[in-house]
Curated annotation (Swiss-Prot):
NADPH binds at S23, Y24, H44, K118, A151, R267, V291, E293. GO terms for molecular function: glycerol-3-phosphate dehydrogenase [NAD(P)+] activity; NAD binding. This is Glycerol-3-phosphate dehydrogenase [NAD(P)+]. The gene is gpsA. One of its GO terms (biological process) is glycerol-3-phosphate biosynthetic process.
Length: 345
């Protein structure tokens, strides 16, 4: 268990620093602080952070949810990183490496880093653990937090379950202790560091496909088939990377996949809906008004599947729609026209 440490800019023990003050980072910080812990929330825009401090709420993304008193708002990265041994990075995947590199000069000798970012490295499709090891070396403990969570429901204190994985069992136990709240927020331990990272990236892509299917008007049968076959693609890619099959039947796999594919709180699903209804990619993204992780994730997962030689027909068709201008309805027709095959393949 982490020892109390008040030797920081705040003069109090800080259980965790959350790096990233978007809707999800803010909701995780709120949830942690509700457990009675002192939590620092850092964001890169001083004006945004000043507004959060003045309002003691994030009215833009989490209306009606007030900040606990123990939540500290910070725009100074050095103070934030130095404040706690444990960092929780919650930023879009395409800036994960940039943000981690910015944190690097301020890391403590005992720093441990967990992330709730879902995605892969842009342009390479590498797992985020490999990005982290390249940037900060292998002397720091790393962990990943993943599962079916919508930011607003988490911030409101509605029941939620999630999983955490790390090669460091002590870090997992400490994260469970800090994050788990038996009344509303359940945290499961998982020992599959690879599979936990992969599930969050692939499900974003499949959610776009589910939205496209519904936008075209294909109905519940088609959506369910797409989710099921999407899970098969996720599992095949995971097997090629050495992940454990059971991970994809858990929170970071099936759980997150079903949530993101079936509820319109999901930006990825709403993005797909717009595409299925005939909007172009740029217009659909603009209407969402926030980062659509699945857009970049599609290219990342497609690149990884090509490199690993794993057949992922749903991912391939969505990639063609997003990056090659293919019509969404034609992509759906091409999926339906594929040759007969056994379900397990």
């Amino acid at each position: 268990m982490t020892q109390a440490n008040t030797n920081n800019a705040y003069g109090k023990d800080i259980a965790m620093t959350v790096i990233g003050a978007g809707s999800y980072g803010t909701s995780l910080a709120i949830s942690l602080a509700r457990n009675g812990a002192n939590v620092v929330l850092w964001g890169h825009e001083p004006e945004h952070m000043a507004r959060l401090e003045a309002d003691r709420a994030n009215h833009a993304f989490l209306p009606g949810v007030d900040f606990p008193e123990s939540l500290i708002i910070e725009s100074d990265l050095e103070k934030a990183v130095q404040a706690s041994r444990d960092l929780l990075v919650v930023v879009p995947s395409h800036v994960f490496g940039i943000v981690l590199n910015s944190c690097k000069p301020f890391l403590r000798e005992d720093s441990r880093i967990c992330w709730a970012t879902k995605g892969l490295e842009p342009e390479t499709g590498r797992l985020l653990k490999d990005v982290a090891y390249d940037i900060i070396g292998e002397n720091y403990s790393l962990a990943v937090l993943s599962g079916p969570t919508f930011a607003k429901e988490l911030a409101m204190g509605l029941p939620t379950a999630i999983s955490v994985a790390s090669p460091d069992a002590e870090f997992v136990a400490d994260l469970q202790e800090k994050i788990h709240c038996s009344k509303t927020f359940r945290v499961y331990a998982n020992n599959d560091f690879i599979g936990m990272q992969l599930g969050g990236a692939v499900k974003n892509v499949i959610a776009i496909g589910a939205g496209m299917s519904d936008g075209i008007g294909f109905g519940a049968n088609a959506r369910t088939a797409l989710i099921t076959r999407g899970l098969a693609e996720m599992s095949r890619l995971g097997a090629a990377l050495g992940a454990k099959p059971e991970t994809f039947m858990g929170m970071a796999g099936l759980g997150d996949l079903v949530l993101t594919c079936t509820d319109n709180q999901s930006r990825n699903r709403r993005f797909g809906l717009a595409l299925g209804q005939g909007q172009d990619v740029d217009t659909a993204q603009e209407e969402i008004g926030q980062v659509v992780e699945g857009y970049r994730n599609t290219k990342e997962v497609w690149m990884l599947s090509q490199r690993m030689g794993v057949e992922m027909p749903i991912v391939d068709q969505i990639y063609q729609v997003l990056y090659q201008g293919k019509d969404a309805r034609l992509a759906a027709q091409d999926l339906l026209a594929r040759d007969k095959k056994a379900e397990g393949k």
